[in-house]
Amino acid sequence: MSSVAKSTANKLDWTKIVSKLGLSGQTAAALTSFKKRNDEAKRILFELKQQPSNVDFAFYKSTLKNTAIVDKIQSDVSKFTPSKANLSKQLNLIESFEAKALENAKETESVVLAELTDLEKTLENIESARPFDQLTVDDVVKARPDVEEKVQDMVSKGRFEVPGYKEKFGDLVIM
């Protein structure tokens, strides 16, 4: 990891990411899971760095009768070189996570923008609407042409009562 990436990773404030970006659902859960794994890896690395790595072979040679085995272990330790781990699989997982997170973020952005546009139109309609008591039948028919069709259909069939009206508002007939 480059020094710039390490510096950025250390400065990253995980608590603000979800709230500032407005993430929710699967994206927020995946980010939280990634943060937990990152914190656990940092903790384990810190603990391992704190452990002493030097072995006092002179102490073991003076304590044990079989110094040949201590010499063998000492030579094996001096020859030991840590193996390089293949991180390509983990890096590919991180890249796929980033790609999926970016895709989810773009989807969320498009949904939010569409919703905002609809809400702005609705607000504009509400602000420009006339008061209810100033509406005419022609205004209602212009806004909802299906209302005129329903009324004409009911009149042609001889129905002059709106279905469900009595159940909802009661019957005002006294006799």
UniProtKB/Swiss-Prot annotation:
Primary residence: mitochondrion
Biological process terms in GO annotation: proton motive force-driven ATP synthesis
GO MF annotation terms: proton transmembrane transporter activity
Sequence intervals crossing the membrane: none
Gene Ontology cellular component list: mitochondrial inner membrane; proton-transporting ATP synthase complex
Swiss-Prot/TrEMBL keywords: Acetylation, ATP synthesis, CF(0), Hydrogen ion transport, Ion transport, Membrane, Mitochondrion, Mitochondrion inner membrane, Transport
Residues where N-acetylserine is found: 2
A matching Pfam family: Mt_ATP-synt_D
Keyword Protein biosynthesis part of the UniProt annotation: no
Domain of life: Eukaryota
Subcellular location: Mitochondrion inner membrane
Topology relative to the membrane: Peripheral membrane protein
Quaternary structure, from the entry: F-type ATP synthases have 2 components, the catalytic core F(1) and the membrane-embedded component F(0), linked together by a central stalk and a peripheral stalk. The central stalk, also called rotor shaft, is often seen as part of F(1). The peripheral stalk is seen as part of F(0). F(0) contains the membrane channel next to the rotor. F-type ATP synthases form dimers but each monomer functions independently in ATP generation.
Family per similarity comment: Belongs to the ATPase d subunit family.
Function as written in the Swiss-Prot or TrEMBL entry: Mitochondrial membrane ATP synthase (F(1)F(0) ATP synthase or Complex V) produces ATP from ADP in the presence of a proton gradient across the membrane which is generated by electron transport complexes of the respiratory chain. F-type ATP synthases consist of two structural domains, F(1) - containing the extramembraneous catalytic core, and F(0) - containing the membrane proton channel, linked together by a central stalk and a peripheral stalk.
Protein's name according to its UniProt entry: ATP synthase subunit d, mitochondrial
Source lineage: Eukaryota, Fungi, Dikarya, Ascomycota, Saccharomycotina
Gene behind the chain: ATP7
